[in-house]
Amino acid sequence: MSYEFILGGENTPRIKLYIACSLDGYIAREDGSIDWLTEYDNNPETDYGYSEFYASISTVLMGRKTYEQVLGFGDWPYAEKKTYVFTGQKEPLLREKNVEFVSGNVGEFTRQLKENTDKDIWLVGGSQLIRAFLEEDLVDDMIVFIVPIILGGGIPLFDRIGKEIKLKMTNTERYKSGLLRMEYNLKPT
């Protein structure tokens, strides 16, 4: 399968997983709910580096379930970014501005995307897509926010990846809210 892209970039963008999880490693409750995160929404005190991160990316990648979850929040928050939704279905729910649905080989698509994009790429999630990206060695950096809550169950951040992955910690930051930001490289820059 071949994919066509509009942009032609000179820099090699990095794929960055930017995500929050509970202390026990869950990104959502069993039903997909992330209500436990609302206490930590961006506020006037801090946006936890989100604005800077968001400005550094041109592309958003997510799975179908994550897409449907984000649609439930109201206005589409990524309208000015090109978004690719990985799905095995023909056409999930609604198509928002700048959204394209993708099926097929994750690795092949993503490698072609990186060759034709000039800014970094945000891997939003969910768990199944994160696993596929890690299995194919496609993630370059992880920015993980540990939220001070134990959910006791739910959708895990890392679900049976099937291999060991060594990380290099590049930065940590602790916020007054109790959140801990940890940054890792999976591949050398």
What do the predicted segments below correspond to?
Residues S2-T189:
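Enzymes that bind and transform nitrogen-containing heteroaromatic metabolites
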